[in-house]
Regions:
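A short, surface-exposed loop/turn module that caps and links secondary-structure elements
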Residues: 31-57
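Short glycine-enriched loop/turn motifs at secondary-structure junctions
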Residues: 9-10, 51, 69-71
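Short, charge- and proline-biased low-complexity linear segments
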Residues: 27-32, 87
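Enriched for short, Lys/Arg-rich terminal
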Residues: 1-2, 59-93
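Arg/Lys-rich, positively charged N-terminal/basic patches that mediate binding to nucleic acids
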Residues: 1-29
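Tryptophan-centered motif/residue detector
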Residues: 12, 30, 55, 76-78
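Non-catalytic, surface-exposed connector residues within folded enzymatic/regulatory domains
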Residues: 5, 39-42, 79
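Active-site micro-motifs of SAM-dependent methyltransferase domains
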Residues: 13, 32, 84
Length: 93
């Protein structure tokens, strides 16, 4: 399945606080995702009440990105450290 993606304004709130090297990796991962979502370990975390899906992808070993999959488009809304990702996922479940 071919997926599209877009970055929400909320995504940039977290993105701007990342180190430059991680921002560069995030840009690389975004391009990789466009070509092949599996290449960034794209996965569905849970189905949301509205029928959309909460998803994640790997940026580096220590950083993840979160998005909502709706109508074959992922709207990325958060990026951060794996530790913060784990905390956020626990809160969302």
């Amino acid at each position: 399945m071919k997926l599209g993606s877009t970055l929400s304004p909320k995504f940039f709130d977290t993105y701007r606080h990342l180190p430059p090297s991680i921002r560069a990796k995030a840009r690389d991962s975004y391009r990789l995702f466009a070509a092949d979502p599996a290449s960034v370990k794209f996965k569905t975390i849970k189905r949301l009440a509205d029928g959309n899906q909460l998803c994640s992808a790997r940026v580096t070993r220590d950083y993840r990105v979160l998005g909502v999959l709706a109508n074959d488009i992922v709207i990325w809304f958060w990026i951060g450290s794996h530790d913060n990702y784990e905390r956020l996922i626990r809160e969302l479940r």
